[in-house]
Amino acid sequence: MTHLRKSHPLIKIINHSFIDLPTPSNISAWWNFGSLLGICLMMQILTGLFLAMHYTADTTTAFSSVTHICRDVNYGWLIRYLHANGASMFFILIYLHIGRGIYYGSYTFSETWNIGILLLLAVMATAFMGYVLPXGQMSFWGATVITNLLSAIPYIGTTLVEWIWGGFSVDKATLTRFFAFHFILPFIIVALVMTHLLFLHETGSNNPSGLNSDSDKIPFHPYYTIKDIMGFMFMGFTILLLVLFSPDLLGDPDNYSPANPLNTPPHIKPEWYFLFAYAILRSIPNKLGGVVALLASILVLALFPTMHLSKQRSMTFRPISQCLLWVLTANLAILTWIGGQPVEHPYILIGQVASMTYFLTILILMPLSSMAENKILKW
């Protein structure tokens, strides 16, 4: 068996990725999120596949087909809510995974980091298109508002929006193409995940100290397979708690009304995991400026490898940078809260201040703190 594991062309790849992979001996539970995301992705693809068997991508029947899944299909309600809450779980894990990468300086593996950013964008696109599919009120208006942002692009904007819609509004053509893209994108995500892992295994994992760990490596199996199973249990428990006790906790009540183009909901907002970016978009009074800020809020991640000025890789021994990272975390929580609030007096100002602080912290304060910490080291 050992011989086969190490010699068979296909099993050899699995062996080098999950069994005999040399892993730093000191990585903490923060390194569990990659495997948790993998499990989450598999769950999303499986539940999505079963949902696609019963769903119809047509404006007249989409809403009732989702109702049919919940009422008449065996365990349809479970599959539907696992899929919907699985997306929330996916984003919680992604954000924690990115936060870990920033804290421990994992972004210095620039290829792995950049593919990670592509993955984030692909997952966001997939989640957005999936949210449109039930053709509820918030689905319809969310799709209308977000796709309409492209009309801010000079000269070609309006044509581009109508081309994406396949008509003059979000209609059957839009739903059909969104379903097609929502189905194919997860497989593209799987390919990107493989590339992400390929580049990661070229360099080996980072570790909490941020130092080279070549002198102290242990095999991935059994040490980290066992450790990951603990993570799977926690994640499984959390998602089942959500699905079985409060499946609509993170959803929007408006989405239980069928889409009605003649009736606009009082507060149009996306799912909770996009609210921080939505708040940044809304805090700029200009349409094109808002779209640019929205893109910048995600793409600013690509600047981390170039903005790393510290002599230390990890933030473990950098108190000023640590404080700034927690300021950034609180800032994102405030943006998420603001994104879900109506556009009126105190919220507009809070949103603008939080948006400004977000970019200020990442682009100016973090590099400055790195330089200050380098100076302190010399003293």
From Swiss-Prot:
GO terms for cellular component: mitochondrial inner membrane; respiratory chain complex III. InterPro entries: Cyt_b/b6_C, Cyt_b/b6_C_sf, Cyt_b/b6_N, Cytb/b6-like_sf, Cytochrome_b, Cytochrome_b_C_euk/bac, Cytochrome_b_N_euk/bac, Di-haem_cyt_TM. Binds 2 heme b groups non-covalently. The chain crosses the membrane at residues 33-53, 77-98, 113-133, 178-198, 226-246, 288-308, 320-340, 347-367. The gene is MT-CYB. Keywords: Electron transport, Heme, Iron, Membrane, Metal-binding, Mitochondrion, Mitochondrion inner membrane, Respiratory chain, Transmembrane, Transmembrane helix, Transport, Ubiquinone. Gene3D superfamilies: Cytochrome Bc1 Complex, Chain C. Its main location: mitochondrion. It comes from the Eukaryota. Pfam families: Cytochrom_B_C, Cytochrome_B. This is Cytochrome b. It comes from Dasyprocta fuliginosa. A ubiquinone binds at H201. Its cofactor is heme b. Heme 1 (or BL or b562) is low-potential and absorbs at about 562 nm, and heme 2 (or BH or b566) is high-potential and absorbs at about 566 nm. Belongs to the cytochrome b family. GO terms for biological process: mitochondrial electron transport, ubiquinol to cytochrome c. It is found in: Mitochondrion inner membrane. The cytochrome bc1 complex contains 11 subunits: 3 respiratory subunits (MT-CYB, CYC1 and UQCRFS1), 2 core proteins (UQCRC1 and UQCRC2) and 6 low-molecular weight proteins (UQCRH/QCR6, UQCRB/QCR7, UQCRQ/QCR8, UQCR10/QCR9, UQCR11/QCR10 and a cleavage product of UQCRFS1). This cytochrome bc1 complex then forms a dimer. It is a multi-pass membrane protein. Component of the ubiquinol-cytochrome c reductase complex (complex III or cytochrome b-c1 complex) that is part of the mitochondrial respiratory chain. The b-c1 complex mediates electron transfer from ubiquinol to cytochrome c. Contributes to the generation of a proton gradient across the mitochondrial membrane that is then used for ATP synthesis. One of its GO terms (molecular function) is ubiquinol-cytochrome-c reductase activity. Heme b b566 binds at H97, H196. Heme b b562 binds at H83, H182.
